[in-house]
């Protein structure tokens, strides 16, 4: 079972562990002269609400998986999450060759293929 402590309207910026590793590898091989004085980049990702994520879960794993979500609001967690950025425009990173998933469905596909316990042989 999984506890959902926030409303389904909460939006996050997401990328897979696969993309995070690709970001590091690409950054390590990047010609840094192209960065100029601004050395920070916002990495690509997917802006998605919790509702978007639940809908993608339903498409990938069915209603049975969604039924395992226990909605229990937690005001402390809601307060923390409320201060997080909701979306980014990672144009600079994209122009430099960084890339990530483009949908929540793709994020779930990557998880099932690489990170789910069944993918690990557990």
Spans of model-derived segments:
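Residue-level detector of short coil/turn "hinge" positions at structural boundaries
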Residues: 65, 100-101
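Residues at alpha-helix termini
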Residues: 59, 95-97
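Residues in well-ordered alpha-helical elements
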Residues: 18-21, 51, 91, 101, ...
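A conserved pocket-lining segment of Rossmann-fold NAD(P)-dependent short-chain dehydrogenase/reductase
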Residues: 1-15
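Amphipathic terminal alpha-helices
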Residues: 71-73, 83-95, 102-122
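Short, flexible active-site loop motifs that bind/organize anionic cofactors or intermediates
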Residues: 10, 43, 83, 97
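Mid/C-terminal beta-alpha module of Rossmann-like enzyme folds, strongest
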Residues: 15, 19-81, 118-120
């Amino acid at each position: 079972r999984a506890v959902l402590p926030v409303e389904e309207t909460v939006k996050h910026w997401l990328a897979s562990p696969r993309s995070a590793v690709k970001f590091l590898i690409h950054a390590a091989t990047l010609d840094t002269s192209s960065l100029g004085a601004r050395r920070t980049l916002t990495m690509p990702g997917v802006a998605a609400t919790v509702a978007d994520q639940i809908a993608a879960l339903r498409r990938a794993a069915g209603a049975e998986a969604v039924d395992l979500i226990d909605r229990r609001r937690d005001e402390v967690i809601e307060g923390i999450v409320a201060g997080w950025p909701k979306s980014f425009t990672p144009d600079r990173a994209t122009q430099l060759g960084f890339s990530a998933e483009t949908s929540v469905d793709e994020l779930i596909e990557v998880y099932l293929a690489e990170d789910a316990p069944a993918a690990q042989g557990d």
